[in-house]
Amino acid sequence: MGRPVTSQEEDARFAGRFLTSTEMDLWRTMDDFDKRHSIDVTRRFVAKRSDATRDETAAALLHDVGKSVIRLGRFGRSVATLLPVTASMRRYRDHERIGADMLLQAGVSKRTVDLVRGATDDDAARQLRAADDGD
């Protein structure tokens, strides 16, 4: 099953249905690949969790926002998951904490921050991880 083909404008409209203006500004800092991935993850997440709250859905859209401050490119990202070669690569591996800190500083809800940080292990957190893994 392939992912739906949508334009960047359609992706932004989809994200805008769930994100506050502050959150949307953060989402826009993500590179195009991560924005597309966030849409795919969110669609899988809400398909499995029809009662997802707005904060939970925002976490799905923003779960990789910490990567926006770490510009490694696709090859560098692959290497970063295998070897802690450089400080940038180590930061990439810590993108959840970085993203959660960005969201916290922006005044985003505690629930969204906790889900992005991976600080909870409830049903929503497990379903978000599964959606991120492609399940």
Label every PLM stretch briefly.
Residues 1-26:
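Non-catalytic interface/linker regions that flank or bridge core catalytic/transmembrane domains
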Residues 15, 24-135:
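Divalent metal-dependent catalytic cores for phosphoryl transfer on phosphate-bearing substrates
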